[in-house]
Amino acid sequence: MASSTPKTLMDFFQPAKRLKASPSSSSFPAVSVAGGSRDLGSVANSPPRVTVTTSVADDSSGLTPEQIARAEFNKFVAKSKRNLAVCSERVTKAKSEGNCYVPLSELLVEESWLKALPGEFHKPYAKSLSDFLEREIITDSKSPLIYPPQHLIFNALNTTPFDRVKTVIIGQDPYHGPGQAMGLSFSVPEGEKLPSSLLNIFKELHKDVGCSIPRHGNLQKWAVQGVLLLNAVLTVRSKQPNSHAKKGWEQFTDAVIQSISQQKEGVVFLLWGRYAQEKSKLIDATKHHILTAAHPSGLSANRGFFDCRHFSRANQLLEEMGIPPIDWQL
């Protein structure tokens, strides 16, 4: 691995150039997404590569659709970086004051989710969950035995604002090995070995939409585009899968799913495996799209995950609703 400081997304893109508006256009032309490039940076990978069907610029902004898409992507990258910085600063400040634990209510900083989940942290179950995590973290204060790190517990929500959500992929609980969990379902930081489930996801992506299989498993590029990568349980004890199940996390993430179902329309839910599919009862199928398949794990991928074509189908559904598709290429 190179020793130089890795570049972030912002290093690769210059400010969008102003173009002269066309008097004959009153709306944006259609765009389609294809391909992409990879870069870990500190938050996400490169923005979607957009193929514009016409070069006509918008009258009001003077920007091409490609420039608009790039600027919007970069805006949300910057926002997710700010949210991450706030969480990191709060954890660092608490440790400097001799506290190992930061209350959960201080780690969800994305305002759109706080508005979508009013009062959730004041409910009795949330207090019990917070007390449980405090005991776990204080007990293990001398070693990082709870994953992901505290500042990444709500990474999925802090990276994908509520009003940005257009696709949801539900996992079960975080990876329980050192350095793997980063608060996004199925995702691992760059440099970590690809788990079998994630490798199978990439294989299906390659077969379905032609994406090349990346060398890393950081899915934050998807998250910034509006793919909510949500685990049902958001923390886990080291080397003990499901150790934080039935402690209150399921109630919280069920509230997240219900808020999407009730307050939004046209979201595409990808439910892989029985555990995720049980969440379908929380989703209004008359307002949203639910795609189901086997889990991508090595044990079940051959029993219905491979050839499910969920990635192309999700984009087809989004485009039919006039919503920009996901650039799945990392």
From Swiss-Prot:
<dbReference type="InterPro" id="IPR002043">
    <property type="entry name" value="UDG_fam1"/>
</dbReference>
<dbReference type="Pfam" id="PF03167">
    <property type="entry name" value="UDG"/>
</dbReference>
<keyword id="KW-0227">DNA damage</keyword>
<feature type="transit peptide" description="Mitochondrion">
    <location>
        <begin position="1"/>
        <end position="49"/>
    </location>
</feature>
<comment type="similarity">
    <text>Belongs to the uracil-DNA glycosylase (UDG) superfamily. UNG family.</text>
</comment>
<dbReference type="GO" id="GO:0005634">
    <property type="term" value="C:nucleus"/>
</dbReference>
<comment type="function">
    <text>Excises uracil residues from the DNA which can arise as a result of misincorporation of dUMP residues by DNA polymerase or due to deamination of cytosine. More active on U:G, U:T and U:C mispairs than on U:A pairs. Highly specific for uracil and no activity with 5-substituted uracil or cytosine derivatives. Required for initiation of base excision repair (BER) of uracil.</text>
</comment>
<dbReference type="InterPro" id="IPR036895">
    <property type="entry name" value="Uracil-DNA_glycosylase-like_sf"/>
</dbReference>
<keyword id="KW-0496">Mitochondrion</keyword>
<feature type="active site" description="Proton acceptor">
    <location>
        <position position="173"/>
    </location>
</feature>
<keyword id="KW-0234">DNA repair</keyword>
<protein>
    <recommendedName>
        <fullName>Uracil-DNA glycosylase, mitochondrial</fullName>
        <ecNumber>3.2.2.27</ecNumber>
    </recommendedName>
</protein>
<keyword id="KW-0378">Hydrolase</keyword>
<dbReference type="GO" id="GO:0006284">
    <property type="term" value="P:base-excision repair"/>
</dbReference>
<dbReference type="GO" id="GO:0004844">
    <property type="term" value="F:uracil DNA N-glycosylase activity"/>
</dbReference>
<dbReference type="GO" id="GO:0005739">
    <property type="term" value="C:mitochondrion"/>
</dbReference>
<dbReference type="InterPro" id="IPR005122">
    <property type="entry name" value="Uracil-DNA_glycosylase-like"/>
</dbReference>
<keyword id="KW-0809">Transit peptide</keyword>
